[in-house]
UniProtKB/Swiss-Prot annotation:
Gene Ontology annotations for the cellular component aspect, listed alphabetically: cytoplasm
Source organism (scientific name): Erwinia tasmaniensis (strain DSM 17950 / CFBP 7177 / CIP 109463 / NCPPB 4357 / Et1/99)
Subunit structure as annotated in this protein's UniProt entry: Homotetramer.
Pathways per UniProt: Cofactor biosynthesis; pyridoxine 5'-phosphate biosynthesis; pyridoxine 5'-phosphate from D-erythrose 4-phosphate: step 1/5
Subcellular location: Cytoplasm
Protein name, UniProt field: D-erythrose-4-phosphate dehydrogenase
InterPro entries, per the entry: E4P_DH_bac, GlycerAld/Erythrose_P_DH, GlycerAld_3-P_DH_AS, GlycerAld_3-P_DH_cat, GlycerAld_3-P_DH_NAD(P)-bd, NAD(P)-bd_dom_sf
Residues reported to bind substrate: S154, C155, T156, R200, T213, R214, R236
Pfam families: Gp_dh_C (PF02800), Gp_dh_N (PF00044)
Keywords, sorted A to Z: Cytoplasm, NAD, Oxidoreductase, Pyridoxine biosynthesis
Length: 348
């Protein structure tokens, strides 16, 4: 069965999802039938073809009116602001990938269902009333047919959760702190300009800028037992892609740095292959650009203090890695099964 998807929002994640669909050879499993984006069609096609972070898209891209052709595939382009007016029923859409970064509530998801979609996957953390939050590689096997509205969590949650699980299973995590060192994002300013967050009024290319993060809440969402046991802070740095995460955890059992690295290296070759990677090469952030893994452990930076405090440095391409997990989770949602009429299950 080929899963029919529509992408709502064709920004950084939406475009990377479509590129990943073709570049990773999963076009036989997933067919993109429509993209909804308020920007003009010519701009959508241009930014798909030419990307500052990820280079030129190798597939032939053509656009005529509101039709986008990628290779031999034709995708309908929509410019509809209201979810309820989207033609998902007409297009027989199985799963909507909502990549707007704006929508994420149950009401938003139900609007997609009422429009005819069978399931919805949000590309960012959603409300607590969604049916499930998935970090692929950790809990996607818990998906059920009745999970219609799903969040793919965040890029940083996808990066750190597999590492937390591995360390906790091996030595028992008691508490932890996380520092996200994140590339600049679209909600920052090119030059100083007004923003409700005064730190984000400053030019993104000239400063390391502390910002709020809900990563600790994201950890608790996946592992409720860590409620009030993790804290997180975040800074934005003057690069356009790739993120590093500094994870420190206090563990119950004594451990050596060499044992931590052995565990994480083994996991990258085994149970977490394709999700976690491991390196001891002297690399820098740009070297992880366009890397499809959720997390890449830098073994040269692993430290253990007093046998019970572990510090690790984990890299991720916050765009490309996350876009690949969007595709993985889409396939997992389809594999879990569909109800006969998603819209009929909504409590009106």
């Amino acid at each position: 069965m080929t899963v029919r998807i529509a992408i709502n929002g064709f920004g950084r994640i939406g475009r990377n999802v479509l590129r990943a669909l073709y570049e990773t050879g999963r076009r036989a499993e997933i067919s993109a039938v429509a993209i909804n984006e308020l920007a003009d069609a010519a701009g959508m096609a241009h930014l798909l073809k030419y990307d500052t972070s990820h280079g030129r898209f190798a597939w032939d891209v053509r656009q005529e009116r509101d039709l986008l052709t990628v290779g031999d595939d034709t995708i309908r382009l929509l410019h509809i602001p209201e979810i309820g007016s989207l033609p998902w029923r007409e297009l027989n859409v199985d799963i909507v990938l909502d990549c707007t970064g704006v929508y994420g509530s149950r009401a938003d998801g139900e609007a997609h269902l009422k429009a005819g979609a069978r399931k919805v996957l949000f590309s960012h953390p959603g409300g607590h009333d969604l049916d499930a939050t998935v970090v692929y590689g950790v809990n996607e096997k818990e998906l059920l047919p009745e999970h219609l509205l799903v969040s793919n969590a965040s890029c940083t949650t996808n990066c750190i959760i597999p590492i937390i699980k591995l360390l906790d299973d091996a030595w028992g995590i008691e508490s932890g702190t996380v520092t996200t060192i994140h590339s600049a994002m679209h909600d920052q300013q090119v030059i100083d300009a007004y923003h409700p967050d005064l730190r984000r009024t400053r030019a993104a290319s000239q400063s390391i800028i502390p910002v709020d993060t809900r990563l600790a809440a994201g950890i608790t969402r996946i592992f409720p037992k860590f409620n009030d046991r993790f804290e997180a802070i975040a800074v934005r740095v003057p690069t356009i892609n790739v993120t590093a995460i500094d994870l420190s955890v206090s563990v119950r059992d004594a451990v050596k740095a060499s044992e931590v690295n052995a565990l994480l290296h083994s996991a990258s070759l085994g149970a977490f292959s394709g999700i976690v990677d491991y390196t001891e090469l002297p690399l820098v952030s740009i070297d992880f650009n366009h890397d499809p893994h959720s997390a890449i452990v830098d073994g040269t930076q692993t430290r253990v203090s007093g046998q019970h405090l572990i510090k690790t440095l984990v890299w991720c391409d916050n765009e490309w890695g996350f876009a690949n997990r969007m595709i993985d989770t889409t396939l997992a949602m389809a594999a879990s099964g569909f109800s006969l009429d998603a819209a009929a299950s909504i409590k009106l």
